[in-house]
Amino acid sequence: MKIDYLTLFPEMFEGVLNHSILKRAQDKGIINVNTINFRDYSINKHNQVDDYPFGGGQGMVLKPEPVFNAMEDINRNEHTRVILMCPQGRPFTQEIAQELSEAKHIVFICGHYEGYDERIRKHLVTDEISMGDYVLTGGELPAMTMTDAIVRLIPGVLGNQASHQDDSFSDGLLEFPQYTRPREYKNMSVPEVLLSGNHAHIDQWRHEQKLIRTYEKRPDLLEQYPLTEKDREILETYKKKLKND
């Protein structure tokens, strides 16, 4: 996968891209990343990339020329996903991360200031993505977050490709509780079922815990999850237990 970042602050990406999973993915040749400072494509002698909005208003707006010019230097085709990081976009989810992990080329447009000239949005962008109902100073941090979520799903990136299959949201539920050694710590014990060696019982316990944890922390996710009759029984039993405690 090729990943290009159009940004005014390419140095922001150095720490994230040069460590951990993203660095290993580059070392393996699975991803090829490139940061492009679109200030270098300004047609203004002062390298200006923003201007006041027509019609008045607060803040500055990114000019179209630097972004369009930078995009012309990127070798892309009709399959390239050009992502605009903006609060108006569709909320980023694990499902979108999985979808984008199958792309061959992604371009992130990371803006600053008040916003973008609308012509950038209309004529260059294939996807508008939001990280949530809040506003950040620029698109760099969301682009880094998305990159991490996307790249770890590409085959060959993780040491054990099945590692992400139990992650929260991978099947629509939150992840089950995890334990490691020591078995006892400050009078807190690991659940006996995890020490039993009975993998069928362990799988059942983990699924029950995923249902319960999702009900406790993100009940909205259960509205979309295809609950079986057994799942409903598990949740009803848990609800009754809560009432009796």
From Swiss-Prot:
Gene3D superfamilies: 3.40.1280.10, tRNA(m1g37)methyltransferase, domain 2 (1.10.1270.20). One of its GO terms (cellular component) is cytosol. One of its GO terms (molecular function) is tRNA (guanine(37)-N1)-methyltransferase activity. Transmembrane segments: none annotated. Keywords: Cytoplasm, Methyltransferase, S-adenosyl-L-methionine, Transferase, tRNA processing. S-adenosyl-L-methionine binds at G111, M131, G132, D133, Y134, V135, L136. It catalyses: guanosine(37) in tRNA + S-adenosyl-L-methionine = N(1)-methylguanosine(37) in tRNA + S-adenosyl-L-homocysteine + H(+). It comes from the Bacteria. It is found in: Cytoplasm. Signal peptide: none annotated. Its EC number is 2.1.1.228. GO terms for biological process: tRNA N1-guanine methylation. Its main location: cytoplasm. The keyword S-adenosyl-L-methionine applies. Homodimer. Belongs to the RNA methyltransferase TrmD family. HAMAP family: TrmD. Specifically methylates guanosine-37 in various tRNAs. This is tRNA (guanine-N(1)-)-methyltransferase.
